[in-house]
Amino acid sequence: GNMASKTDSATAHLAEFAVQAGWQVLSFDLPEHGDRKGRELPCTMPQCVEDTRKIWAYAHEHWQTVGLFGVSMGAYIALAATANEPPAFAWLLSPTVAMGRMIEGMMRRDGITPEALKKAGRIQTAVGQVYWWADYTFVALHPARTTCKTAILYGAKDDLTGLSDMQAFVKENDCELTVSGVSAHWFHTNDDLAVFDAWLKNQTARVAG
């Protein structure tokens, strides 16, 4: 997810359940995240998707069955990267399924027009938020979609993806949706992680069984 890393609580919990089931886990940081902070590659959608495709190709070279776990914008990126070679199953935590709507809303909040972004290519606000024209055009051309068996855990208090957008995505893509009444977008409190663990236990048992 945005400003997260491969060592965050959600990923650590996922890895624990996966290893207990006898699976192996590949986890990596997006550009400008975790161990990749301070390097030259920008965290744009095209770059993130390209990186994810490389990891995906590596996974398929080494294992016959490959599942997917993604969080927030990482879930969107993973779905875009694997569109032509879908996973056996996907588990998504707080996925940003309406990425275009979210970016447009943030731009309106910050007083940035599409015309200004197209002209500049990149705009950084006073608080550090960075907008890329490459992202704006990419998400317009690549709406979130999934064609594999997909389970989603979503917080009822999520302020980045509205419930109506989530329900529309679930219906259109025939996903399984679990809503946590105690959670917002970022699952990190003890209550959040308890819900997440119960969800992971259920999903792991269903796939392993």
Kindly give the residue locations of the regions a language model identified.
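Short beta-strand immediately N-terminal to the catalytic nucleophile in serine-hydrolase-like folds
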Residues: 68-70, 93
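Gly/Ala-rich beta-loop-alpha elbow adjacent to hydrolase catalytic centers
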Residues: 70-78
